[in-house]
């Protein structure tokens, strides 16, 4: 299959290099268009007030992988690839492998998930892949999961669904299995470290700690939430969509229409 891969960690990240190289080994035609630097937590931002630059990169990936480094955001990269750089549209857009989890409400901030969602917006089935650790360096099990999912998914897949996949940071033999999950809750205690620059003006660094939470599971609910499943060393597969409408409220708030 023809695959487009992007990320938010940048072209030098081990996660995207491992993923692209493994997919080429599996027989896929792979093009990488990703940021030229770290772009984590940029959400679905686009570059509108300055030019976007893209240049071919050689020597970082398997020679069979075509690689572009882009000055824009992850969403810019996918939009530019689909609109200009690729001669043919891909069968799938993949994003990752992210250096860190994208669980629960993380997906609202994630450049990794947003890059994949851009593919869905353009009508192409997409997968976001995240290794659930900021320090782990072995991306091979996660890359193997990507190969397996592409083999098992129907082709063509639904173009309106993004699969957000989180892989536990354990050896392959310790992965408990693959679970279809719903989105959980993952909140943070935000802290702002205030400092003063050499000119005497204050500036701030956003820091903080994650508060691991998950919504209570209903007895009849067979689908775990992603936060719970990853704790138990399951690969989590969470279907997401760009339609954020709260449909139950349409009838409850119908009296507002006039």
UniProtKB/Swiss-Prot annotation:
Xref: HAMAP family: SurE
Disulfide bonds: none
Protein name as it appears in the record: 5'-nucleotidase SurE
Keyword Cytoplasm: yes
UniProt entry keywords in alphabetical sequence: Cytoplasm, Hydrolase, Metal-binding, Nucleotide-binding
Cell compartment(s), UniProt: Cytoplasm
EC number(s) recorded for this UniProt protein: 3.1.3.5
Function: Nucleotidase that shows phosphatase activity on nucleoside 5'-monophosphates.
Bound cofactor: record note: Binds 1 divalent metal cation per subunit.
Gene: surE
